[in-house]
From Swiss-Prot:
Its main location: membrane. Residues 1-6 are periplasmic. Belongs to the ZipA family. Residues 28-332 are cytoplasmic. This is Cell division protein ZipA. Residues 40-51, 93-105 have a biased composition (Basic and acidic residues). Residues 40-189 are annotated as: Disordered. Residues 76-88 have a biased composition (Low complexity). It comes from the Bacteria. The chain crosses the membrane at residues 7-27.
């Protein structure tokens, strides 16, 4: 019961408050509208009282009338009324002022000016006479009097910015493309060869030659046999049986030998070569080839050289062995 009564009181109070607000808004709007209706009437009445009779006849604006009222400077004016003769004087004064404003140069006397080009005084007419004269007068500029005609007729050179450089005409996208370049790719390591040829040279001393008969005896003692392609071969069996381990050829083209004329034959050197991989152990085969080359060099009085025709060194021997290991690893 108490809750229902409280709810009713709240609703009634809210309605009363809303009614008071609406009544206040309606009252204030009514007063404001009446205030705005009265203002234009008061303004028109005040403007009608302040506007003189001369202004009404001539149609001069209100601002100009206020700035030209002479009533305050004349002591004969009465505070209550204004004499009609003052309006006539005021109107005539304004007529004179207007006529003077229309022609401000009529009372100016002509002034003579000295022209440096004509060496005489030239009267300067008033602006009105100049306007009434020729519509297109010729004006001489003293700054152009001493300029040669060649300079006037010569075409002017274009400014630097009239022709932009080619570097500025290039698109931004190109300069960005040039700046951001991909990193150079590292060259890929060459794949290990699956086969190689090891070469040794046995050459005579500088300026010498190796005799054919002496060379043939040394080759036979080292286990070489004359065979295919008219060159000598070293087989697994020194008697000439089994696969070929390495071969020996003449350094002079065509690289072959003629066994029947070996006694009449001479050469600056011979070449021993071995293919890797080969039959058996390639490392042992290379060791046997190196021993055979050293033996032949001792027999004929020559020296052993590598594949670059340089003296054989322990470092070069290790290089040969490394090449053998690489090839065997590639074929594993």
């Amino acid at each position: 019961m108490m809750q229902d009564l409280r709810l009713i009181l709240i609703v009634v109070g809210a309605i009363a408050i809303i009614a008071l607000l609406l009544h206040g808004l309606w009252t204030s709007r009514k007063e404001r509208s009446s205030l705005f209706r009265d203002r234009p009437v008061k303004r028109a009445k005040k403007a009608r009282d302040e506007t003189p009779l001369d202004d009404l006849d001539e149609g001069v604006g209100e601002v100009r009338v206020k700035g030209a009222r002479p009533q305050q400077s004349e002591p004969s004016f009465d505070s209550a009324s204004v004499d009609s003769s003052s309006f006539d004087n005021y109107g005539s004064a304004r007529e004179d002022v207007r006529s003077e404003a229309k022609s401000p140069f009529e009372h100016m006397s002509p002034v003579s000016a000295y022209d440096p080009l004509l060496d005489e005084a030239t009267p300067v007419d008033s602006p009105r006479s100049q306007v009434r004269g020729d519509a297109n007068p010729q004006v001489v500029d003293p700054r152009q009097a001493f300029i040669p005609e060649s300079d006037i007729d010569a075409p002017r050179e274009p400014f630097a910015y009239d022709a932009p450089s080619s570097a500025q005409q290039q698109p931004v996208s190109h300069s960005l493309h040039e700046k951001v370049q991909p990193a150079p790719q590292q060259p890929a390591e060459p794949a290990a060869a699956k086969e190689t040829v090891l070469v040794l040279h046995v050459v005579a001393h500088q300026g010498g030659v190796i005799g054919g008969e002496l060379l043939l005896q040394s080759l036979l003692q080292a286990g070489f046999q004359f065979g295919e392609m008219n060159i000598f071969h070293r087989h697994v069996n020194p008697a000439g049986a089994g696969p070929v381990l390495f071969s020996l050829a003449n350094m002079v083209k065509p690289g072959s030998f003629n066994v029947d004329t070996m006694s009449e034959f001479s050469t600056p050197g011979v070449s021993i070569f071995m293919m890797v991989p080969s039959y058996g152990d390639a490392g042992q085969n290379f060791k046997l080839m190196l021993q055979s080359a050293q033996r032949i060099a001792d027999d004929v009085g020559g020296v052993v050289q590598d594949d670059e025709r340089r003296m054989m060194t322990p470092q070069k021997v290790e290089s040969y062995k490394a090449r053998i290991r690489d090839v065997l690893k590639a074929n594993a």
